[in-house]
Amino acid sequence: NPYFRTKDSASELEAAGVDLISPQFANTNVDLPALPAEAYRLVEDKSLYAVMDIGGDDRGAYALGRYTPFLLEEGNYRMAFVANPCRPLTRTPEEALEVMREIEAAGGLPFTAIVNNANLAHETTPETVLAAVPYMKKLSEMSGLPVWMTSAEETVAAGLTGKVPRLLPMKLQ
């Protein structure tokens, strides 16, 4: 999958103590919704805290589906819908809700929260993120899910301090 960019930061993640498990074909033009067998330890080893990036559509969620029985049995998971109103398929809360439901149906797991990730890549400003607050509120009302946090690149986040609750500044790789 050419869009799986986490693999680009493998050395930085490993240096920070993060064990990256990625598909064999990550960062290639092969787009298979599959994860390696070693990913099972994420649901089998209860001492681990795992973050899984399944992508922004139902195709990535199919790969998650194999873990659904383990996650539902435990009931100890958080699955966030990372919403960006600047993307073509989620420009309105209604479109975002449709994508959300498609992902849930494909993976067999319900979302538990929403993350405001409004961005225009390197053109993002604090105003870009703040303009998405009403969108996120409406998506929250429509879905019945809370807006868990707002994520933004570090320099953008600096302009959001005190303006949005639960701000997560991110360093882009």
Q: Which residues are covered by each model-predicted region?
A:
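Switch II (G3) loop of P-loop NTPases
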Residues: 23-28, 47-64
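Active-site regions of enzymes building and remodeling cell-envelope glycoconjugates
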Residues: 160-173
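Glycine-rich phosphate-binding loop signature in dinucleotide/nucleotide-binding domains
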Residues: 43-50, 74-75
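Conserved catalytic-core segment of NTP-binding enzymes
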Residues: 58-163
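N-terminal phosphate/diphosphate-binding loop that engages ATP/GTP or pyrophosphate donors
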Residues: 1-31, 35-38
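Conserved beta-strand segments of alpha/beta enzyme cores
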Residues: 19-21, 146, 166-168
